[in-house]
Amino acid sequence: MTATEEPNRCRIVLIAPRIDDPAKLKSLISAAAEGGDVASLILPAYGDGETAFQHRAETLVPVAQAHGIAVMIEDDTRIAGRVGADGIHFEGRKNGLEELIEKFQGRMMIGTGGAKNRDDALELGEARPDYMFFGRFGYDNTPSPHPRNLSLGGWWAEMIELPCIVMAGNEIASVEAVAATGAEFVALSSAIFAEGEDPAAQIAAANVLLHAKAARFEAGE
């Protein structure tokens, strides 16, 4: 899907799963990318050392970018630069985010997460990142999105101009609840990559639901 064909409604952000086998992970991401519209892919570090994390990023970034999917690397600017990623996803305090934005915004996208309440989110938002993420990597282990993430996403989407991403649950149908908040993006991981699932079919199904249920945004929103 080209930029001119991007849908004007809530879109999918993939969170790469915690899988140690690079070949298997590459196959899963490639299959998901074939399933339909995906806006971006976030690569969490999952506690890996620098060498292992960089190898994973080197494996996945070209696959995603070949399908027009922007790739965000969690926290490590050196790895992001080495592998030609599109941006950094930062989980931390406002001062760290401000420093990151000062150094890299303009060259890379800078997104953030980790807010547990409205005050946290507003403090991080003052740094003007490219997006706010509500949720935690690896915690999409229930069918529905976490109520706190839905609440924060709905409040943010209504009150703040910066785009937000809300973590969905481990069932595809949960994208509807996220889209209903007005969030610009819905994050999916276990719903796509669970053992036995077809990532392409799951992405296609999620896009069908979003196309049918998600509100349309006005131009410029």
What spans do the regions from the language model cover?
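Flexible, active-site-adjacent loop/turn segments at secondary-structure boundaries
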Residues: G135, S190-A191
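Flexible, gly/pro- and Lys/Arg-enriched active-site loops
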Residues: G92-E98, R136-M159
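Internal alpha/beta core interface subdomains
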Residues: A183-F185
